[in-house]
From Swiss-Prot:
One of its GO terms (biological process) is negative regulation of myotube differentiation. The chain crosses the membrane at residues 113-133, 142-162, 203-223, 240-260. One of its GO terms (cellular component) is membrane. This is Inactive phospholipid phosphatase 7. It comes from Homo sapiens.
Length: 271
């Protein structure tokens, strides 16, 4: 027994790894990975496989995700066209808004441009039509003025209803004036001044005998009213174009429901 112990001590002394400079090689590293046996134990019978329901749910999600990605990354042609037209509309409206603020390039002409827009406002037109109706002494004149008043009231209600429904803001942060609040012309789409100018100009061209220069000036006035609303930053270009279309449609509607002279006289006498 003592002989075997002495032989074991001799082997330990002759072992190179038992020297002081190699003792660190025999010690396991701190914070190192666990031995493989622990990994085999973790993957043993005690580990439970995921339930079958989760796997089916993940497969369904993986099948749905590529379709959603394709829908987002490949929009339809209508969506691309609509977004492109909207971007062009905003860019043109920003460029044409040269009187939108005090720091704009045409800020000195803002008052004159706003004055042109006021000529297409509903309050002056309704007030002027009522005044002319009171002063008129002919049945034909009263008939035309009563139908014009009907067209103006129809325009205000139509524009206010569509603006309240869509609620589109203008290209610049401009607050509506007091006259705009009175006629409920608060939002941008459609442009109420443009629809009114188009409707009134078409009405006058159809029911008044005017010389050719006056007809040309009437059309130019309607175009200038619409352009002035874009220049002060109140409306987009598409708002004004839509206003022109709505004004023409309103004129056609008034022509369909035109009140005869007898109806106009009855309304005037009741008033």
């Amino acid at each position: 027994m003592p002989a075997s112990q002495s032989r074991a001590r001799a082997r330990d002394r002759n072992n190179v790894l038992n020297r002081a400079e190699f003792l660190s090689l025999n010690q396991p590293p701190k914070g190192g990975p666990e031995p493989r046996s622990s990994g085999r134990k973790a993957s043993g019978p005690s580990a439970q496989p995921p339930p079958a329901g989760d796997g089916a749910r993940e497969r369904r999600q993986s099948q749905q995700l590529p379709e959603e990605d394709c829908m987002q990354l490949n929009p339809s042609f209508k969506g691309i066209a609509f977004n492109s037209l909207l971007a062009i509309d905003i860019c043109m409206s920003k460029r044409l808004g040269v009187c939108a603020g005090r720091a704009a390039s045409w800020a000195s002409a803002r008052s004159m441009v706003k004055l042109i827009g006021i000529t297409g406002h509903g309050i002056p037109w309704i007030g002027g039509t009522i005044l002319c109706l009171v002063k008129s002494s002919t049945l034909a004149g009263q008939e035309v003025l009563m139908n014009l008043l009907l067209a103006l009231l129809l325009d205000i209600m139509t524009v206010a209803g569509v603006q309240k429904l869509i609620k589109r803001r203008g290209p610049y942060e401009t607050s509506p004036s007091l006259l705009d609040y009175l006629t409920m012309d608060i939002y941008a789409f459609p442009a109420g001044h443009a629809s009114r100018a188009a409707m009134v100009s078409k009405f006058f061209l159809s029911h008044l005998v005017l010389a050719v220069p006056l007809r040309v000036l009437l059309v130019l006035w309607a175009l200038c009213v619409g352009l002035s609303r874009v220049m002060i930053g109140r409306h987009h270009v598409t708002d004004v174009l839509s206003g022109f279309v709505i004004g023409y449609l309103q004129f056609r509607l008034v022509e369909l429901v035109w009140m005869p002279s007898s109806t106009c006289q009855m309304l005037i006498s009741a008033w």
